[in-house]
């Protein structure tokens, strides 16, 4: 679901995500409190739209970008248009269009070209290309009402695929059929992934 903001920009939040708007006549600003957001920034004479997060700030004059928590850091993906990243330590970095960066308050952790499917959740899908099962399980958790346990023995298994986020039962079954794992459902609120 999208929200149309007062300046004409459009915001989409991922499951269990939270953002706080700080919009007034003088500034355009959002704070990512938890999860992931996609923002389509409309150009405005007041200047760039500021996105605050635990690890720094992103400014974008116009375009589309994704900001998401990932492994204790923040993922920034510039889908369309460029942005400026200011890390928690004050370092500034110009980010070109179609780039993907991972950063924390201490600075840049990784950067590279945008990967296919990084924003697929906005369309209801998780697109995975050679990621660990631990990464996939973490991506599934916001869409499950309870606990998803993952046995450490299988956490490193590599996964590729396209998974429907609005049908976790099917997504988990797909993992069980494609990997040497067992999906144990004790209830809708307690699911465990174990070695086969």
Where are these regions (language model features)?
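N-terminal export/assembly leaders
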Residues: 107-196
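Short, small/hydrophobic-biased targeting/export segments
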Residues: 1-105
